[in-house]
Curated annotation (Swiss-Prot):
Functional note: Exhibits GTPase activity. Binds RNA but is probably not involved in ribosome assembly in mycobacteria.
Chief location: other
Subcellular localization, as worded in the UniProt entry: Cell envelope; Secreted, Cell wall
Keyword DNA damage included in the entry's annotation: no
Induction or repression: The mRNA can be cleaved by the RV1102c mRNA interferase in E.coli.
Annotated spans, G2: 39-43
Source organism: Mycobacterium tuberculosis (strain ATCC 25618 / H37Rv)
Family classification: Belongs to the TRAFAC class TrmE-Era-EngA-EngB-Septin-like GTPase superfamily. Era GTPase family.
Protein known as: GTPase Era
Length: 300
């Protein structure tokens, strides 16, 4: 009988390198927020990949970056705490962008603070976005940048190309161990955290670059509708830092907030498996990213 292997894999990389999309592709369900805006992941969400022979627990962290605010510093601290406690670090570098200072900075951080006994796998993401010769050129550049990688694996989370190969590579690097989670469980995040992330993702679609860093979502209340077994009421608040940002989220005559509500409600109904009434309110918490008390109140 084959020995069972299990362990924790942390995906790191600069913002917007496809880490959350890759997590969802590996798990086969939506457990991490995806957006075209950088630094949209706020919590270390664990996705779980099940097999008869192994179990991979994926930790999807915020993008590691040079911090400009207290929130940015806390997010970076979260990343470092996470990869100090994992078996494999998956460094994500996209195929469609040249290696830049941000990538080099992260590699240096891994060299200087990453645990010596942790396996490093480099994942070249978004290979569907460029021709094959550019993928090959990026693989060469990555091998020159990261000389201590156990493997370099090119993948496309969008098309699924080589995702199975990546799973095999990650599983092979795990130690022998038990199944930490029951079969069929895809994440250990509470439903309220996932709901807040889904609302946040819907609110980030098609807005200006500065908004992601200024938008937080708090679930105020979740309760079954009295007399209706098939309906759940979800009340949530979207916090921004300035009145001008409140206008961006709400839109003209509330049109954009209604679009956000429709998109988020559909995702939450899929998550909960039932009909949902979603009530969204937009509030201003001035400069919350730099205020320790407000950061704590908003879940950071």
């Amino acid at each position: 009988m084959t020995e069972f292997h299990s362990g924790f894999v942390c995906l790191v990389g600069r913002p917007n390198t496809g880490k959350s999309t890759l997590t969802n592709a590996l798990v086969g369900a939506k457990v991490a927020i995806t957006s075209t805006r950088p630094q949209t992941t706020r919590h270390a969400i664990r996705g779980i990949v099940h097999s008869d022979d192994f179990q991979i627990i994926l930790v999807d962290t915020p993008g590691l970056h040079r911090p400009r605010t207290l929130l940015g510093k806390r997010l970076n601290d979260l990343v470092r705490e996470t990869y100090a406690a994992v078996d494999v670090i998956g460094l994500c570098i996209p195929a469609d962008e040249a290696i830049g200072p941000g990538d080099r900075w992260i590699v240096e951080q891994l060299r200087s603070t990453g645990p010596a006994n942790t396996t490093l796998v480099v994942i070249v993401t978004k290979i569907d976005k460029v021709p094959k010769e550019k993928v090959v050129a990026q693989l060469v550049a990555v091998s020159e940048l990261v000389t201590n990688a156990a493997e370099i694996v090119p993948v496309s989370a969008m098309t699924g190309d080589r995702v199975d190969l990546l799973i095999d590579v990650l599983a092979a690097a795990l130690p022998a161990g038990p199944a930490y989670y029951p079969d069929g469980e895809l994440t250990d995040e509470p439903e309220e955290v996932l709901m807040a992330e889904l609302i946040r993702e819907a609110a980030l679609q098609g807005v200006r670059d500065e908004l992601p860093h200024s938008l937080a979502v708090v679930i105020d209340e979740v309760s079954p509708r009295e007399g209706r077994d098939d309906l759940i009421d979800v009340h949530a608040a979207l916090y921004v830092e300035r009145d001008s940002q409140k206008g961006i989220v709400i839109g003209k005559g509330g049109a954009r907030l209604r679009e956000v509500g429709t998109a988020a409600r559909s995702q939450i109904e899929n998550l909960l498996g039932t009909k949902v009434y979603l009530d969204l309110r937009v509030k201003v918490a001035k400069n919350w990213q730099r205020d320790p008390k407000q950061l704590g109140r908003l879940g950071f």
